[in-house]
Amino acid sequence: MKLLKFGGTSLANAKKFLCVADIIEKKNKKEQIAVVLSAPAKITNYLATIIENKIDDEVLKKINLAKNIFIELIQDIKRIQPLFPYENTKSTIEIEFNKLKKIINGILLIKQCPEGIKPIIISRGEILSVDIMKNILQSRNHEVTILNPVTNLLSIGNYLDSTIDIKESKKRIKKINIDQKNIILMAGFIAGNKEGELVVLGRNGSDYSAAILASCLNAKCCEIWTDVDGVLTADPRIVSNTYLLDYISYQEAMELSYFGAKVLHPRTIEPISQFQIPCVIKNTNNTESKGTWIGKENNPSDNSLKGVTYLDNIIMFNISGSCLKDSGNTIARIFTILSRESMKIILIIQSSSENQINFCTFEKDIDYILLILKKEFTLEIKEGLLNDFNIVKNLTILSVIGSNISEKNNIASKIFSSLGSSKINVLAIAHGSSKHSISIVIKKENLLQGIQNIHNTLFFKKTIINVFLIGIGGVGKALLKQILKQEKFLDQKNIKIQFRMIANSKKLLFLKNSINLNNWEENFKKSKEKFNLTILNELLKNTCDSNSVIIDCTSDYILSKQYISFIKKGFHIITSNKKANTDSLKYYSEIRTTALKENKKFLYETNVGAGLPVINTLQSLFSTGDCLISFKGILSGSLSFIFGKLEEGVLLSEATKEAKKLGFTEPNPFDDLSGIDVARKLLVLAREIGYSIELKDISIEPILPERFKKYQNSEEFLFKLKELDSFFSERVNKARDIGNVLRFIGSIEKNGKCSVKIEEINSNNPLYKVKNGENALTFYTNYYQPIPLVLRGYGAGNDVTASGVFSDLLRIIL
């Protein structure tokens, strides 16, 4: 005997009803099957609103609407399965809803709904589900036995939330003579009290019914069919990289359920655990999925964690005062009164040294708990033995579940570390009270980030980097291509780079999980989300996981002024944008102070030398105590190319035009030839070395006369540049005559004096052969003399710059 239970989502429409019938048929070929059915999706909730709201004439309209849902359902079944007895089923539906209408008319007369009538109203969906399934199976030539839960399941409790007496119910069902060839059907959610009245079993009542019937029939297995593949390691609506659990123990399932996982209600687990009946969670939308097996305790060698879950809308009561220490029965009185009033206490945290106790409960109970506690301890409060009750609202309890979790090394420390990385404070912790769970209390606003951090730390073997990319010009696109190309390599290194946002100055593409880099451009074009700083900051507010990074591949000054704000939100910053590092010394220092305080990285390797390891090399060098004697460098790839062409006899205007065509220059080459870009890079280096200077402190010897500033149009600028061709040719020839070349060089002296100018250098200089877009940097230091440290390579181009950004990205996790 095997028991199958199908929830409301599995019976949501005609196709799903018939799919359930197919599953029942297939299972019945191997062994006898008992089936427990819920009402079709949303029907029970719909009927519940009838008894929860004011009973008036509008209720009859709602009854008709509910009836029509069932009529449409069986009409669709008839179209798909022609032998289905539509007229007989329709007649049953009409009879049931006519009963409801008579009940409602009676309620309208007495102007109230008796408690005993409420379960009759809200249980119609389950009863009709059984009748519809009976008719489907009989039309397929199957014999069916229907068990009446009112007469066979004895309940204890109130009309709307009863508990089953398993022992008595077992006796009753044992007396029934059921043909072993018959398929057994029973409505879930329903039972009968000792007076024979219909009652319902409260939340998850159908699952509970299934567990009870499985126990009563001595079923060898209880299958709970729903709309998910089984038990996952976390809520997939919140955490993107969850995975299916093959097996969990009864106790683990109980803990998961108790702390909020939508697996099974604890009441459902109790009977299957008591009678050692295995339970399988299966998916009617994916019948091939193996599901999750719930059974006896795990093998002691099983060290795997099983899930992270949460309870929302929690409050924490803080009760303090001298009587907690001096009077031993005060704490007992607190929990006796709460137990007597059926108030659920989720966590208890006691601190005897501070004469206080904290307990967590649901927010909905706050007013009543406050009322009964004040009434109970009126005298103690009046005498000052108890302080006013302090209540902390808007909390969440996160719980990590796993067998013998309290004995596992480093689990608690990993939890705290993952939360600490995002500045999430832990208000309370329960560790050791249950050997299968660790629970922490945090603010509700940190739920999303907290559960993602913990899950990624404990359950995902790969190190995840969440990227928010702003700027998809040449460098941004090259970066995306490089990361896509390296996916296999990164996978081998257990690194997963997830792009959560891709944006330009006009719009953005954002996904809660991860953007597929194979078709990001197509999806970006489809996106209708606008981009501005207000929208960006709102989006970032609730999306920061551990290892979340903002990459700025723009040259936008306003965006660079947001870096401190981004860091405070929990993001690392990687930027090829030089604006922040060349802003005021005050802002430059504030970024670093904030990054240090928030334990975040601010990386900008490509600010100087594109993909060359300049910044990282300098930081490593000077952190070991080395000191600069002097520096000279060619810091512009575009000017390296142009001056190299001048050396070959190419005219200035033609060399500049060729550099622009190859993508070495800014849109208007004046920006390159002005020398300001080289000055900014020199400023970054000087500050990195330790000099507290501003951009205005750098002496720039202009390449061009002042009058060229007015030519903002690139074509006009290049045309006018011809006026300087002969001057530069003469200057180049003069240098060549004595064996020298011209180079545009940035210099830093030991006293911090910085300059940018054209210099004439000979063949002994390390910069002599640097051209064709190369950068070269020569550092004379205490450690590197008389031969300098030289860094040389291409310092311009999208690919090398993107490579530098990519390198910074991997440094986030190193």
Curated annotation (Swiss-Prot):
Q: Which InterPro entries match?
A: AceGlu_kinase-like_sf (IPR036393), ACT-like_dom_sf (IPR045865), ACT_Aspartokinase (IPR054352), ACT_dom (IPR002912), AK-HD (IPR049638), AK-HSDH_N (IPR041743), Asp/Glu/Uridylate_kinase (IPR001048), Asp/hSer_DH_NAD-bd (IPR005106)
Pfam families in the cross-refs? AA_kinase, ACT_9, Homoserine_dh, NAD_binding_3
How many cofactor units bind, and how? A sodium ion is seen in the structure; a metal ion may subtly affect the relative position of the nucleotide-binding region to influence enzyme activity, and could increase the stability of the enzyme.
| Record-annotated active site | 681
Q: Where is NADPH annotated to bind?
A: 475, 554-555, 576, 578, 797
GO function terms (MF aspect): aspartate kinase activity; ATP binding; homoserine dehydrogenase activity; metal ion binding; NAD+ binding; NADP binding
Region: Homoserine dehydrogenase, residue numbers: 470-814
UniProt name for this protein: Bifunctional aspartokinase/homoserine dehydrogenase
